[in-house]
């Protein structure tokens, strides 16, 4: 079985306040063993990082300014996770942001039934 362990960092805690993803990191596992396939991107959120989020991840607006946008990496991210079970700690948080980003660009959302939450 192929799985992807996924984590995100964001500009804040809520998509209702239009916070965005600033980092996506994934590793692929086959039968729980890393395959050395990795997806990692820092993202330009096109909005300021909140002070609280900066204290968590340390990514400044200046650092993120020249990074790709979610729109620019969406297809490669979709291809990386496609058909794989996704493992996320606190999945509700990460999925709310990932699916918010997908809605903004009219892409299908990640189906919760394909996700294992470690929380």
Set out the residue ranges of the language-model regions.
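Short, flexible loop segments at boundaries between secondary-structure elements
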Residues: 116-119
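Conserved non-catalytic scaffold segment of RNase H-like nuclease domains
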Residues: 1-114
